[in-house]
């Protein structure tokens, strides 16, 4: 007997390891920005509109191109989208960023500039899709159909785009 599984109403997450090489002047500009402590050692750029700076125009264009692929080719949306807020998050090895989502936004994206090591992940979590909050099950293994948490491994040059309502952390 054959069966089919349909990932109905799934949440598509776009990720790509790019060949994008950050110029030294871009890295220097990022390092020259002012940062504020956001807790857990996570530092956020005080400027939440970094793509307005010409020094980062090449990075902005790269991000816009990936957003266009995600919205036009993956989601097949006719409308055009643009990046509003943009900021830098800095963390040292072992530091984390608490679970959060981005209200008043449609899509969120992360472009990784400098990842050290091979164990960096972008974590996601969601409410259970079946029997939400009523029953908890044990699983013989976890997969994309039964998990409430999932992650994507990332490295320098990786781009990840996802719906802004999706809770995420590092």
For each feature predicted by the language model, list its residue ranges.
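Non-heme Fe(II)/2-oxoglutarate
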Residues: 1-79, 96
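Residues at beta-strand starts and edge strands
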Residues: 10-12, 82, 105-107
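A residue-level signal for beta-strand positions that form part of recognition/binding surfaces
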Residues: 13, 85, 121
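A short glycine-rich, His/Asp/Glu-containing loop-to-beta-strand
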Residues: 81-90
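Catalytic core of non-heme Fe(II) oxygenases with the double-stranded beta-helix
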Residues: 91-161
């Amino acid at each position: 007997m054959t069966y089919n599984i349909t990932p109905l109403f799934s949440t598509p997450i776009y990720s790509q390891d790019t060949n994008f090489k950050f110029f030294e002047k871009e890295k220097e500009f990022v390092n020259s920005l002012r940062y504020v402590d956001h807790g857990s050692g996570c530092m956020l750029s005080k400027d939440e509109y970094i793509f307005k700076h010409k020094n980062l125009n090449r990075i902005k264009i790269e991000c816009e191109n990936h957003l266009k692929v995600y919205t036009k080719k993956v989601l097949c949306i006719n409308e055009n989208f643009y990046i509003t807020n943009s900021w830098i998050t800095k963390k040292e090895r072992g530091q984390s960023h608490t679970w959060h989502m981005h209200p008043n936004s449609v899509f969120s994206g992360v472009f990784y500039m400098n990842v050290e090591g091979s164990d960096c992940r972008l974590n996601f979590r969601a409410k259970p899709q079946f029997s939400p909050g009523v029953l908890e099950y044990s699983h013989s293994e976890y997969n994309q159909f039964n998990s409430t948490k999932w992650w994507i491994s990332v490295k320098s040059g990786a781009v990840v785009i996802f719906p802004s309502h999706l809770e995420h952390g590092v």
